[in-house]
């Protein structure tokens, strides 16, 4: 489906193997060296979520009893929880594996699951990907709200100071990094 405009909210999650929990909320090792960035853009008015998921260091095959092995779960920091949204598993011919696109509800995973619940309390949700050798999760990361257009890092300056900020955007225009670069005249 085509990406809508505008979005009502944006979220990011930085996944690491040390944040993985089993179903009883016990810390469980994820895949060593795995990292991940998941960026989500929500239009809760039209019940649409768009996603850009990048997983360097995750070894397929993916495996989960759910429809796919890449999810947003409901669970605060340190708490396991049920999957609420399933996304296509990342793919690729090498490293990193990626998945991107948009999907429209209604959400059918869990009772009462709506995108506006994520908007109301993003810290109550995390994202993860499950692999055959790491069934509890290869990695996991808590959702964090991002203002549309990115975040002010405080880095940078003016051309008079010799330094200026430079923003880098990934696929679909999502801010993926801000660097400060010297201005050379």
Question: What is each model feature region?
Answer:
Residues 1-70, 74-184:
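Metal-centered catalytic cores of metalloenzymes
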